[in-house]
């Protein structure tokens, strides 16, 4: 019972999604090889990053417990129900944070540790706070969400270069339509707690146009690894095909479907697209 609640506090779904994108960065650096040579490092960086993301999610839960209690989709979270106290959650998050730093420092490299720490600070210290204050919080949160693939890449090469920037841009531009789709689907919940989400402040019609704008930027960014010479023809073809398909389905839905169906379409294909891209990167 308690193990399940502590696991829930760490948001395993978010961890899993971020580890998929981390894998994309790792595969780009190793040219789609995770053999005996790279397997230990792959395991270490996965564990280290997973622990840091889990820590970030725990502290996010602590800060958000007041609004979580008022939203339908979050009202059963452990801190809201009282299954876990704030003190217990703080200790838990701190332990996860320390373990992550130890794993990344001793078993991966210092650069990757600093990159992940930056992601943690942006997520907990900037995004979590700013989402109550500004419509731009989603964009700020996109910075932290674009960190894992960069960490996967630097775990192997131990440098920041244009390939790392390309990975960052791909994930950053992907996250905006993905996140705004979620905001549209749960707009009633966000209205309850008066969060200044873009669909609430600027309206659904404006939000849909912004989503398509970032989707177009995402399509362009998907070509960057191949342009830089780090991704092969197979990876380039897969990336461009799935990105263009997502763009096509989203535009099609924009023209013919209701707002909710449009949001579901963008969200559903965002998951398929980023998974396909990350698992064929290299």
From Swiss-Prot:
InterPro entries: Protohaem_IX_farnesylTrfase, UbiA_prenyltransferase, UbiA_prenylTrfase_CS, UbiA_sf. Belongs to the UbiA prenyltransferase family. Protoheme IX farnesyltransferase subfamily. It catalyses: heme b + (2E,6E)-farnesyl diphosphate + H2O = Fe(II)-heme o + diphosphate. Signal peptide: none annotated. Pathway: Porphyrin-containing compound metabolism; heme O biosynthesis; heme O from protoheme: step 1/1. It comes from the Bacteria. GO terms for molecular function: protoheme IX farnesyltransferase activity. This is Protoheme IX farnesyltransferase. The chain crosses the membrane at residues 9-29, 39-59, 79-99, 102-122, 139-159, 165-185, 210-230, 231-251, 261-281. HAMAP family: CyoE_CtaB (MF_00154). Its EC number is 2.5.1.141. One of its GO terms (biological process) is heme O biosynthetic process. It is a multi-pass membrane protein. Carbon 2 of the heme B porphyrin ring is defined according to the Fischer nomenclature. Keywords: Cell inner membrane, Cell membrane, Heme biosynthesis, Membrane, Transferase, Transmembrane, Transmembrane helix. PANTHER family: PROTOHEME IX FARNESYLTRANSFERASE, MITOCHONDRIAL (PTHR43448:SF2). It is found in: Cell inner membrane. It comes from Francisella tularensis subsp. holarctica (strain LVS). Converts heme B (protoheme IX) to heme O by substitution of the vinyl group on carbon 2 of heme B porphyrin ring with a hydroxyethyl farnesyl side group. GO terms for cellular component: plasma membrane. It holds the Pfam family UbiA.
